[in-house]
Amino acid sequence: MKKTLMLLVMVVALVILPFFINHGGEYGGSDGEAESQIQALAPQYKPWFQPLYEPASGEIESLLFTLQGSLGAAVIFYILGYCKGKQRRDDRA
Protein backbone atom coordinates (compact mmCIF):
# COMPACT_ATOMS: atom_id res chain seq x y z
CA MET A 1 0.00 0.00 0.00
CA LYS A 2 2.79 2.43 0.96
CA LYS A 3 4.69 1.68 -2.26
CA THR A 4 1.57 2.23 -4.37
CA LEU A 5 0.83 5.53 -2.66
CA MET A 6 4.41 6.70 -3.16
CA LEU A 7 4.30 5.80 -6.87
CA LEU A 8 0.98 7.60 -7.25
CA VAL A 9 2.39 10.74 -5.61
CA MET A 10 5.41 10.61 -7.93
CA VAL A 11 3.19 10.28 -11.02
CA VAL A 12 1.02 13.21 -9.93
CA ALA A 13 4.16 15.28 -9.28
CA LEU A 14 5.50 14.44 -12.75
CA VAL A 15 2.22 15.57 -14.28
CA ILE A 16 1.88 18.79 -12.25
CA LEU A 17 5.50 20.03 -12.03
CA PRO A 18 5.96 20.92 -15.73
CA PHE A 19 3.20 23.52 -15.39
CA PHE A 20 5.30 25.43 -12.85
CA ILE A 21 8.80 24.92 -14.24
CA ASN A 22 9.83 27.59 -16.78
CA HIS A 23 6.35 29.11 -16.71
CA GLY A 24 5.84 31.36 -19.71
CA GLY A 25 8.92 30.07 -21.50
CA GLU A 26 8.96 29.31 -25.18
CA TYR A 27 9.20 25.71 -26.21
CA GLY A 28 10.65 25.01 -29.62
CA GLY A 29 11.41 21.85 -31.48
CA SER A 30 14.89 20.38 -31.66
CA ASP A 31 14.85 20.68 -35.46
CA GLY A 32 14.50 24.45 -35.31
CA GLU A 33 17.17 24.74 -32.64
CA ALA A 34 19.55 22.56 -34.66
CA GLU A 35 18.92 24.65 -37.77
CA SER A 36 19.79 27.88 -35.96
CA GLN A 37 22.96 26.33 -34.51
CA ILE A 38 24.07 25.07 -37.93
CA GLN A 39 23.50 28.51 -39.44
CA ALA A 40 25.56 30.08 -36.63
CA LEU A 41 28.44 27.62 -36.97
CA ALA A 42 28.50 27.13 -40.75
CA PRO A 43 26.49 29.76 -42.67
CA GLN A 44 27.58 28.29 -46.03
CA TYR A 45 26.02 24.89 -45.21
CA LYS A 46 23.36 23.72 -47.69
CA PRO A 47 20.89 20.94 -46.76
CA TRP A 48 21.30 17.67 -48.65
CA PHE A 49 17.62 17.39 -49.50
CA GLN A 50 14.22 18.94 -48.92
CA PRO A 51 11.45 17.27 -46.88
CA LEU A 52 9.03 15.12 -48.88
CA TYR A 53 6.05 16.61 -47.03
CA GLU A 54 5.88 19.89 -45.13
CA PRO A 55 2.92 19.97 -42.69
CA ALA A 56 0.63 22.97 -43.02
CA SER A 57 0.90 23.93 -39.34
CA GLY A 58 2.61 23.05 -36.09
CA GLU A 59 -0.53 21.28 -34.88
CA ILE A 60 -0.50 18.91 -37.84
CA GLU A 61 3.20 18.32 -37.33
CA SER A 62 2.54 17.45 -33.67
CA LEU A 63 -0.31 15.14 -34.70
CA LEU A 64 1.90 13.27 -37.16
CA PHE A 65 4.69 12.99 -34.59
CA THR A 66 2.25 11.60 -32.02
CA LEU A 67 0.74 9.15 -34.48
CA GLN A 68 4.20 7.93 -35.44
CA GLY A 69 5.11 7.38 -31.79
CA SER A 70 1.81 5.63 -31.07
CA LEU A 71 2.21 3.31 -34.03
CA GLY A 72 5.77 2.48 -32.97
CA ALA A 73 4.64 1.74 -29.40
CA ALA A 74 1.78 -0.44 -30.71
CA VAL A 75 4.19 -2.50 -32.81
CA ILE A 76 6.67 -2.91 -29.95
CA PHE A 77 4.03 -3.95 -27.42
CA TYR A 78 2.34 -6.27 -29.92
CA ILE A 79 5.65 -8.07 -30.42
CA LEU A 80 6.26 -8.22 -26.66
CA GLY A 81 2.76 -9.60 -26.06
CA TYR A 82 3.16 -12.14 -28.84
CA CYS A 83 6.47 -13.36 -27.42
CA LYS A 84 5.05 -13.52 -23.89
CA GLY A 85 2.01 -15.49 -25.09
CA LYS A 86 4.23 -17.84 -27.06
CA GLN A 87 6.40 -18.39 -23.99
CA ARG A 88 3.35 -19.16 -21.82
CA ARG A 89 2.05 -21.59 -24.43
CA ASP A 90 5.42 -23.36 -24.55
CA ASP A 91 5.59 -23.51 -20.74
CA ARG A 92 2.19 -25.26 -20.59
CA ALA A 93 3.17 -27.88 -23.15
From Swiss-Prot:
InterPro entries, A to Z: CbiN
Please verify whether the record's keywords include Transmembrane.
yes
Question: Is Cell inner membrane found in the keyword set?
Answer: yes
Q: Which residues cross the membrane?
A: 5-25, 63-83
Q: What is its subcellular localisation?
A: Cell inner membrane
Name the pathway it acts in. Answer: Cofactor biosynthesis; adenosylcobalamin biosynthesis
Question: What Pfam families does the record point to?
Answer: CbiN
Report the superkingdom from the record.
Bacteria
Membrane association type = Multi-pass membrane protein
Return the PANTHER family for the record.
Answer: COBALT TRANSPORT PROTEIN CBIN
Summary of the function given for this chain in its UniProt record: Part of the energy-coupling factor (ECF) transporter complex CbiMNOQ involved in cobalt import.
Q: Which family does it belong to?
A: Belongs to the CbiN family.
Subunit composition? Answer: Forms an energy-coupling factor (ECF) transporter complex composed of an ATP-binding protein (A component, CbiO), a transmembrane protein (T component, CbiQ) and 2 possible substrate-capture proteins (S components, CbiM and CbiN) of unknown stoichimetry.
Instruction: Please state what the protein is called.
Output: Cobalt transport protein CbiN
- Taxonomic lineage from the root: Bacteria, Pseudomonadati, Pseudomonadota, Gammaproteobacteria, Enterobacterales
